[in-house]
Amino acid sequence: MTKGILGRKVGMTQIFTKNGILVPVTVIEATPNVVLQVKTNESDGYEAVQVGYQDMREVLSNKPAKGHAAKAKTSPKRFIREIRDVELKDYEVGSEITVDSFSEGDVVDVTGTTRGHGTQGNIKRWGQSRGPETHGSRYHRIPGSMGSIINRVPKGKKLPGHMGGKKVTVQNLVIEKVVPEKNVLLVKGNVPGAKNSLIFVKSAAKAAK
């Protein structure tokens, strides 16, 4: 069954395994998430657990959000997500999900929003090669010809534009260490997003059986 938790990206560091191998890891701080709602087939048409992360100031909330959080005997949350394919009997409204639900060696998928780079050209955005610098060349960093046949820009054409700021999931990352007293997960490798950005960690969908 799927496990999941919301947290924030602290940054990257490195640790040594028992065999003395240096492993780069991402530090994810995941303070306890609160179960706001348990959805069932009878009431909602599908099964899921709704969790909330990070308290929201009362002045920024509204009455529906306050009422929804009050059912779980908690304050309104800034971030709310759903986790599907879970064992519903393991969750109760108002209970907490902590990093203890994961263990070392678990394979997870990590979702975050990539860092925004603003408007960028083809070389930075798509990794295209640049043209000659000298000998009368007028082709340096421009995209180049798109052809003269179809008289339109084909869908998906790689052109300059906004780079980054997209939701990305990195699959099959390994949890190297769990630090319950600090609410921290150490995940092998890098994950999308800037420091302090929202991160969603859940059991891998395509992990080797």
Curated annotation (Swiss-Prot):
GO terms for biological process: translation. PROSITE patterns: RIBOSOMAL_L3. The keyword Signal does not apply. SUPFAM superfamilies: Translation proteins. GO terms for molecular function: rRNA binding; structural constituent of ribosome. Residues 112-122 have a biased composition (Polar residues). One of its GO terms (cellular component) is cytosolic large ribosomal subunit. Keywords: Ribonucleoprotein, Ribosomal protein, RNA-binding, rRNA-binding. Residues 112-146 are annotated as: Disordered. Belongs to the universal ribosomal protein uL3 family. One of the primary rRNA binding proteins, it binds directly near the 3'-end of the 23S rRNA, where it nucleates assembly of the 50S subunit. Part of the 50S ribosomal subunit. Forms a cluster with proteins L14 and L19. This is Large ribosomal subunit protein uL3. It comes from Lactobacillus gasseri (strain ATCC 33323 / DSM 20243 / BCRC 14619 / CIP 102991 / JCM 1131 / KCTC 3163 / NCIMB 11718 / NCTC 13722 / AM63).
